[in-house]
Amino acid sequence: MIVHAVPDEPDFPGDIDRVKMESPRKFFSTINANVGEVMRHTDKNVASVAAREAMRLYRCGLLFDHDYDDNDSTKLYCSELVERAYLRAGVSLAEKRRHDFAVPGFHFEHVIMPSDIYESSQLKTISRF
């Protein structure tokens, strides 16, 4: 199973944006993704602790953080969820990488981008498709 946070992918009418858990088949469905990659931490113990923390966060029923505010632990965005799970294991995948950017009508500060986690030397690729 894959725990993740995503906006605008409701599972049923009236579903809210939240931390979700889905099968790999659904997560990597061509409806949701054109390409994919499975990566794991090089230390199995770290990966195990991070996985348990991701499950705990899922069970909390946290909403998706549309403000992309990593100072607010009551809501999580996608990369923040991954970083928080690994921090519980004592590891930062994003390290100090953060971004400030603006899009029309919004200004975001200190955001962890997916590429910040992807660039971690602590992860190894298991599969690409």
Please provide the spans of the model-predicted regions.
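A broad, structure-centric signal for solvent-exposed, well-ordered loop/edge residues
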Residues: 9-12, 45-48, 100, 124
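Glycine-rich catalytic cores of cysteine/serine-nucleophile enzymes that process amide/ester linkages
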Residues: 1-40, 63-76
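Short, surface-exposed linear patches
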Residues: 24-26, 59-62, 87, 98-100
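Sec/Tat-exported extracytoplasmic proteins
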Residues: 6, 42-45, 54-62, 85-93, ...
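Short hydrophobic/aromatic-rich motifs at helix boundaries and adjacent loops
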Residues: 22-26, 51-56
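Stable alpha-helical elements in mature extracytoplasmic
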Residues: 46, 50-54, 74, 78-81
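Activation targets extended, charge/polar-rich intrinsically disordered C-terminal tails
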Residues: 66-129
